Amino acid sequence: GDVYKRQKLIIPYGLFVCTGSVSPTLAQKYTGFSEEDLNLLWDAIMNMFDFDKSACRAEMATRKLVIFKHDSIYGNAPSHKLYERVHVKEVNPGKPIRSFSDYEVTVNDTDLPAGVSIEVRE
């Protein structure tokens, strides 16, 4: 067969953006999920690739965790509006991306909705 059909595609660098949420009302009512559990979850997300060094994910790492905290268990703002405050842009558009430093990640923390705060972990 054709040798090119057997070669793996190599992407020199990729940046994944993930979003998620925790429902405090469901956690309180059904699971007993606590603030301590939440902190363990944040630590797990930050370190989830430390012991997962397969050939296809050799250098994966969590680079930044942006946490939006609400004063109310029912939330103080829609999650999609908060996610829109996180911006990722190329430092040198048009130049090949080779590392995390080729991106600029910013969080707009001005005029936050009442009852919302931001924590950033790196």
Where are these regions (language model features)?
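Short, small-residue-biased leader/transition segments that mark boundaries at the very start
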Residues: G1-Y4
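Beta-strand elements of well-folded, non-transmembrane domains
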Residues: G20-L26
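Short conserved micro-motifs at the rims of enzyme active sites and ligand-binding pockets
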Residues: K29-G32, P78-S79
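Long, well-ordered alpha-helical scaffolding segments within enzyme catalytic domains
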Residues: F33-D52
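C-terminal accessory extensions/subdomains outside the catalytic/core fold
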Residues: Y74-E122
